[in-house]
Amino acid sequence: MGIEIRPLSDVMAAEAVGGDLKTGVSPSERDALSQAITDHLVLCIRGQDLSPTELVEASSLFGEPKTFVLRNDRIEDAPEVSIVSNRPPLLGGKPLVQAKHWHTDDSYLAEPATLTLLHAVTLPVTGGDTEFINCYAVLTALPPNLRGRVDGLRAVHKYLSRRNESWVAKRSGEEEDETPDVDHPMIRTHPLSGRMSLYINPNRIDHILGWDEEGSDALLDTLYEFAFQPRFQYRHNWQPGDLVIWDNRCTMHRANADYDLTQPRVMHRVMLEGEIPE
């Protein structure tokens, strides 16, 4: 039996049933999975039992896994894998919901990751969902006067943005050198689908290039308020063994904090080498 792709909502997201990335997939199955990511933006491959090194190998089906910037979050024998936990090592085991504000991965880099793969290792009994926003749909729905204000603008993305509301891991000197400030277009075109999306990141955008803080903050706040509407969202309820893949070029996401923080939530994450947004 081959892999079956099933939509999970009308907004975005699908699940793939019947594939085992550990034992391998055929070229046609790989192409079907890749196309499902392009078509649905978020793809959940169910029932995957993958070690960190197997996760890296599976990730290579969709692109080139990249070594994670922050050394403290890497798995030693698989540096492409970072640990996303509600007990970050840098906090000495103190509970924390990481990434609970809307964002897209890696936008503080000149070539942000194309895809992120997140594998469920340990889940709370209930809650701990991940929510996603379809940024194609956001751009399409923007009122013409607001869309006209955004056309041609670029935003400055920083690892430590003055507007960031989330906990951010401290960088080493070497890591700071590897993550200088960058700027990206606020509307980008997806190289595979040819579609345009609103490319914003509340965690990392510091200001609109060439604008003063007051004017920049006002427009960004307006865009964020519009983008955060439930009509653009899909909420993923994790199951053991889920491998969720999303496209950072046309989505935002956040972790949900509606669960008992005494229960561990541990994920293994791989991001794929990116490209300059255009």
Residue ranges and their predicted role:
Residues M1-L243, R249-E278:
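Non-heme Fe(II) oxygenase catalytic core, chiefly the N-lobe of the double-stranded beta-helix
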